[in-house]
């Protein structure tokens, strides 16, 4: 997730109330932090917290020194908070297409999400959009990049994360801090998703080894995530075909319900996909809609394209990959250039 802090502190007059409230929360959660170094030197710091902070330091160092990501003061401070995530984010799509509802922000351009520190505020925005006929999703976000506006801290709820999850999160957000393209939310998230996951696996191999439980668990977790994304991609393609027809909007909505119901039945039947972990149990209960599918598409649709570039043109080096992304970004549409380059 990127730039949420800037969303809270930039905008037009119609957003003043939103900006003032969310900006105050941003300051609350980014101040009153403790330097990691002083906590490590403090003998009263618990062993659990100490080990966690050392792990975060190691991940951050790896991201900077080995992956070539930006060296800044993110994740050098710690914040104790009594919640299990940071913000609730609203996204919406047209009910009969994958046209995303966009919010306009100075500096960042048009983005398909809006964040809130209090769930009732997010639910209110979601209700407003549902009344307008949009498919809506409200999701929990555990971290975001403020692109240098503040020093992004580590939060106490992250202590429960697996090594892969915390490494992927930190590297994902540091990727945003390293390269951000205005108005290109899909590319920004796809790039950060790819670098975050690939970088996390590299760090795990170096730190724990490929035969370790930490690495094997990460492989299983990623295999399940890839399978889940492939299932959603297949569903999205079926719905896209429905939306491309010349039938009426009402007929499209009816057919959409049929396609989603059929998809859910397939998740629970004899031919149900086999997942390695319990993370994706009870998928048939998912509240699937265009906003949900669009969310996953934004983060993953062109990850295979970026992976192919990473392997073929960067020799499997994230450092070279990031350098190439910066060079392509300076010349225009990154993904168009990647596709063209791979076709040669």
Language model features: what each stretch is:
Residues 1-10:
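Bacterial N-terminal signal peptides
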Residues 58-225, 237:
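Acidic/His-rich structured neighborhood in mature extracellular/periplasmic domains
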Residues 229-344:
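Pan-zinc metallopeptidase signature
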Residues 18-23, 220-227, 287-294:
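A ubiquitous short alpha-helical element
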Residues 44-45, 58-68, 175-179, 196-208, ...:
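Sec-exported extracytoplasmic/periplasmic mature domains
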Residues 29, 42, 49-56, 115-122, ...:
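Solvent-exposed, acidic/flexible segments
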Residues 9-34:
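Bacterial Sec signal peptide processing site at the extreme N-terminus
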Residues 30-47, 103-111, 285-287, 304:
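Acidic/histidine-rich, surface-exposed loop or edge segments in extracytoplasmic proteins
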């Amino acid at each position: 997730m990127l730039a949420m802090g800037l969303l809270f502190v930039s905008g037009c007059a119609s957003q003043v109330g939103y900006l003032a409230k969310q900006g105050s929360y941003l300051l609350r959660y980014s101040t009153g932090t403790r330097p990691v170094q002083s906590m490590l030197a403090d003998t009263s710091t618990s062993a659990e917290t100490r080990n966690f902070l050392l792990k975060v330091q190691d991940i951050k160092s790896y991201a900077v020194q080995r992956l070539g990501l930006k060296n800044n003061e993110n994740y050098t401070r710690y914040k104790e908070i009594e919640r299990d995530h940071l913000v609730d984010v609203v996204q919406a799509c047209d009910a009969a297409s994958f046209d995303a509802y966009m919010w306009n922000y100075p500096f960042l351009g048009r983005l398909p999400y809006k964040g809130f520190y209090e769930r009732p505020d997010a639910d209110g925005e979601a209700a407003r959009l549902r009344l307008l006929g949009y498919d809506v999703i409200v999701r929990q976000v555990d971290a975001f990049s403020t692109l240098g506006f503040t020093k992004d801290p580590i939060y106490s709820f992250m202590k429960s994360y697996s090594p892969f999850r915390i490494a992927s999160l930190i590297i994902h957000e540091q990727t945003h801090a390293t390269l951000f393209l205005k108005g290109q939310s899909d590319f920004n998230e796809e790039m950060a998703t790819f670098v975050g996951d690939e970088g996390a696996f590299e760090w795990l191999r170096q730190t724990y080894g490929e035969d370790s439980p930490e690495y094997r668990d990460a492989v299983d977790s990623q295999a399940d995530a890839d399978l889940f994304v492939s299932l959603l991609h297949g569903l999205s393609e079926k719905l896209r075909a429905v939306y491309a027809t010349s039938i009426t909007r009402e007929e499209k909505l009816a057919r959409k319900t049929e396609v989603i119901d059929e998809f859910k039945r397939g998740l629970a039947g004899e031919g149900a996909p086999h997942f390695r972990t319990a993370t994706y149990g009870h998928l048939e209960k998912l509240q699937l809609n265009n906003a949900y599918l669009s969310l996953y598409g934004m983060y993953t649709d062109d990850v295979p394209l970026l992976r192919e570039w990473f392997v073929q043109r960067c020799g499997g080096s994230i450092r070279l990959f990031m350098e190439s992304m910066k060079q392509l970004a300076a010349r225009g549409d990154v993904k168009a250039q990647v596709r063209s380059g791979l076709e040669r």
